[in-house]
């Protein structure tokens, strides 16, 4: 979905200091996401293949994609000669932009402009029965394999007959209390068990621990990647998949164990996965 006059739309949005916003009273907001990704290489690169997952879904609960634009610049190449990315969907329905180039001399720039709207009137993101029963969201992944400590935590947290949302909230609060946020301690291959043992980590570690415990407690759950206003870079949180209270279908309920809260209007979902 490309907007013919993105510049005009951007000009109407305006800016504000999010620290001064009384978020509980906000019912609707629009966001401009500007991302500039630059890749530098020590020398010429041949047969480059790049995959980008930066475009939010068309709809996700109260979030709606309004418009998007991607510019690609390769020094030394006229814009009309830069290849156009191919669009596809991965197994979870996320939009993937695939870019290929025969040769890159030194660098390549990807610049994205994305506008999304969010409101509080909409229900949580509705999911299909196929998604709810997908084993990918109920069984451990490589990064969420449980150990004895995670199993013990799940057993303690699952005491009682809590509804899925209440149990998820209990797990969310517990994970938040167990870790201290700290950069440089963990990496992209750090497992939930390792992060819990360290009791330190970043948002992806909080999310992996919550995913592991939710699945041990019988709650299907998935990883969410997106943006949190004021964080600067990307952020990760969790969606717990549950039947709707009226029994009509299924929804994805968001939780952010890093901050110990429920994501609101200041969160933007980009992609979901295991």
Question: Where is each model-derived feature located?
Answer:
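Short capping/connector residues at structural and topological boundaries
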Residues: 46, 50, 142, 186, ...
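Residue-level preference for alpha-helix termini and adjacent loops
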Residues: 40, 44, 51-53, 98, ...
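Secondary-structure boundary elements
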Residues: 116-120, 124-201, 209
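Linear, non-domain "peripheral" regions
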Residues: 1-152, 218-219
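Generic structural "secondary-structure junction" signal
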Residues: 43, 47, 54, 72, ...
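Short alpha-helix boundary/capping motifs
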Residues: 37, 65, 199, 203, ...
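Hydrophobic/aromatic-rich core segments of domains that either
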Residues: 173, 205-274
């Amino acid at each position: 979905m490309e907007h013919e006059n993105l510049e005009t739309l951007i000009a109407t949005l305006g800016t504000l200091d999010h620290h001064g916003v009384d978020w509980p009273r906000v019912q609707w907001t629009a966001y401009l996401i500007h991302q500039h990704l630059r890749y530098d290489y020590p020398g010429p690169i041949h047969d480059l293949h790049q995959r980008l997952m930066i475009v939010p879904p068309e709809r996700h609960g109260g979030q709606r994609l309004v418009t998007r634009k991607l510019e690609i610049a390769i020094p030394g190449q006229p814009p009309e000669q830069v290849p156009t990315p191919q669009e596809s969907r991965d197994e979870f329905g996320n939009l993937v932009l695939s870019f290929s180039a025969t040769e890159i001399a030194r660098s390549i720039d990807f610049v994205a402009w994305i506008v999304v709207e969010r409101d509080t009137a909409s229900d949580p993101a509705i999911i299909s029965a196929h998604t709810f029963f997908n084993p990918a969201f109920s069984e451990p992944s490589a990064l969420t394999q449980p150990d004895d400590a995670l199993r013990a935590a799940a057993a303690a947290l699952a005491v009682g007959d809590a509804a899925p949302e209440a149990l998820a909230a209990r797990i969310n609060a517990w994970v938040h209390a167990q870790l201290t946020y700290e950069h440089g301690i963990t990496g992209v291959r750090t497992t939930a068990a390792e992060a819990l043992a360290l009791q330190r980590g970043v948002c992806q570690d909080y999310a992996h621990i919550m995913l592991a415990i939710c699945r041990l407690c019988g709650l299907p759950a998935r990883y969410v990647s997106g943006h949190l206003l004021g964080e600067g870079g990307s952020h990760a949180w969790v969606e717990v998949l549950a039947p709707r209270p009226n029994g009509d279908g299924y929804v994805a309920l968001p939780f952010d164990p890093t901050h110990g809260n429920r994501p609101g209007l200041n969160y933007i979902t980009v992609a979901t996965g295991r």
